[in-house]
């Protein structure tokens, strides 16, 4: 049996362009755009698309993210941006619900 969390509780917003790329975790930059996170930054969501000077960012719901470093634990885990568009365990981050981890692809499904 396959389980999918895709689209559950998704809230997607549009921001002016920024420095973030599709699939990366992002933050709201100084100019109000979807900007790439530095290592240790708290992230607001995941960029789904960017074109025409605007960025579409998922800020709530279940979403797949890449991770680096240690595999995130299932359940509530403190995560922050790793500076490459992925997430990593980091005590200075925020707590997210991790429901699935793929160690081969180094991805996790989290609830924003």
Please report, for each region that a protein language model flagged, where it lies by residue.
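Surface-exposed, low-hydrophobicity beta-strand/loop segments enriched in small/polar/acidic residues
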Residues: 1-112
């Amino acid at each position: 049996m396959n389980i999918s969390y895709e689209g559950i509780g998704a809230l997607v917003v549009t921001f002016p362009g920024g420095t973030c790329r599709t699939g990366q975790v992002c933050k709201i930059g100084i100019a109000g755009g979807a900007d790439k996170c530095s290592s240790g930054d708290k992230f607001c969501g995941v960029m789904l698309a960017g074109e025409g000077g605007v960025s579409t960012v998922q800020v709530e719901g279940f979403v797949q993210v890449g991770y680096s470093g240690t595999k995130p634990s299932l359940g509530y885990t403190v995560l922050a941006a790793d500076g490459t568009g992925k997430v990593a365990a980091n005590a200075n981050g925020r707590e997210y619900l991790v429901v699935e981890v793929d160690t081969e692809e180094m991805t996790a499904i989290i609830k924003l």
